[in-house]
């Protein structure tokens, strides 16, 4: 006979007490829930199976991981863990809302992704990669060593300025002692190379290298001018620099160029450049326009008696000779005359009535000349025809 209690003795503890089984299940569920709340998937666990399809659908190119790390500016992300005092219900209201899905929602620089589940985080990473691929890359990035490069340029200009000042002072001392001043000529090539560089134009002006240029262009203690090569290189270099009024005040180079403009020993070709530079520098100071439409021309009456008296006296102003002409005169050789352009500053006044009378007189003379010319032309044609043909056999055109 079978035991009636055998079926009950073989039951497990859960089957005997269902309430205890439910309690045990709840105890096991709570740590699993805590683990899921604090669980953060690692980057290698995220799979992007549909990335290629999504990127191909919007016709963009997928960037590489190196480009995403090195060149793409990513948003600052806070990955702080959620405080334990919060409950899961506090995050359920916005758990299903993705970034940018609500109307009027604006993305901020700081985004907390700790409240996102793995699916939302995966979507967020994909949106960032897509926005980085679509974003135009024509924005100029500041170089990491740009500040160091500017500092190096400033140090280079300061060092050259000190060398130029020392060379100028040394030449002044040698000239006062009656020696040959050659320190500036030794340093001229280096100075010309620096002044010719367009990328150093702003550092040259900011570090006031024009002050050293002024010292090089100043006359020596014995009233002699600097070497012609120094004048030529430095004055030509001043044309390429964007010199403003502040730079002129700080360096004082304008006074030296005014001396070169008024001096008779300045080479004519250099004097033209100096005149143009002084005109360009003084125009904004005097509030004058560089347009020829706004240019004012001085007019003066022509004095015939004054001109005839000057011719009768035979006084002719001697023009400044060039270095080539001076060398030829010193060697007692002939020099090829050079062409020179004359610039007039005063325009003569014109009498319109006198011009009209002259035009009418010329018109009457032209009519008389045309009539005489046509008559002479017809006579010459007849003479040529008579000489060529002669009298005919029948006696036509025969003078009796």
Swiss-Prot record:
Residues 211-288 form the TFIIS N-terminal domain. Residues 119-130 have a biased composition (Basic and acidic residues). GO terms for cellular component: nucleus. Transmembrane segments: none annotated. Gene3D superfamilies: Conserved domain common to transcription factors TFIIS, elongin A, CRSP70. Residues 19-34 have a biased composition (Low complexity). Residues 1-50, 77-149, 375-400 are annotated as: Disordered. Residues 84-99 have a biased composition (Polar residues). Pfam families: Med26 (PF08711). Keywords: Nucleus, Transcription, Transcription regulation. Its main location: nucleus. One of its GO terms (biological process) is poly(A)+ mRNA export from nucleus. Transcription factor involved in RNA polymerase II transcription regulation. May function in both SPT15/TBP post-recruitment and recruitment steps of transcription. Belongs to the IWS1 family. This is Transcription factor IWS1. It comes from Candida albicans (strain SC5314 / ATCC MYA-2876) (Yeast).
